[in-house]
Amino acid sequence: MQSHQIQPAPEPPGPSPQAMAAWQSFLQAHTVVTRALERELVATQRLPLAEYDVLFQLSAAPDGRLRMAQLADRVLLSRSGLTRLVERLEGVGLVRREVCPSDARGAYAVLTTTGRARLRAAMAGHLRSVQEHFGDVLDCQQMESLRVALDQLVAANLAEPAGCAQDVAPPKP
């Protein structure tokens, strides 16, 4: 009589120890630096980092406007969290929403003049904090290596943003 032993399923392949160590360091660095930036921005400007980030991303976009889906891909919030945040910012006049002309289900977030002024008032202090907690800690070579590695991660993981038909390709004359 043959004895059949049940073999355990093989462990799925996982990250190498180096990858796990890098991942943990990335998470910890992200947490401690963003908490420090948040604390200082709220203390000096009464502006949470997520709100600053939305205002900044809009200010960097053409015409100060982005599709909500595009904005969600650029900030530290879920799409539902971004919707609630944009509603709050709209309520205090820092952004406004516009319907996408070619897709009524889609919307743009647009930076207002008041929003641009609010961002400008917060920017100098925030940039000093970024320099203190980030720029002063790494040398130029470390900064460039980190930028290249992070850009590679973004490119490998960023989903293609949704857009209005007019965002996808410019109209042909």
Model-derived segments and spans:
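Residues within helix-turn-helix
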Residues: 68-69, 80, 87, 107
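Base-recognition residues in the alpha-helical recognition helix of bacterial helix-turn-helix
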Residues: 24, 53-57, 83-85
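Alpha-helical linker/hinge and terminal dimerization helices associated
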Residues: 33, 37, 75, 118, ...
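C-terminal regulatory/oligomerization modules of transcriptional regulators
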Residues: 1-17, 140-173
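N-terminal leader segment of winged-helix/HTH proteins
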Residues: 1-45, 92, 172-173
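Charged, amphipathic alpha-helical coiled-coil/dimerization segments
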Residues: 2-4, 8-10, 87-145
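N-terminal helix-turn-helix DNA-binding core of bacterial DNA-binding proteins
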Residues: 35-78, 164-167
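Short, locally clustered residues in the helix-turn-helix/winged-helix DNA-binding domain
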Residues: 27, 56-60, 123
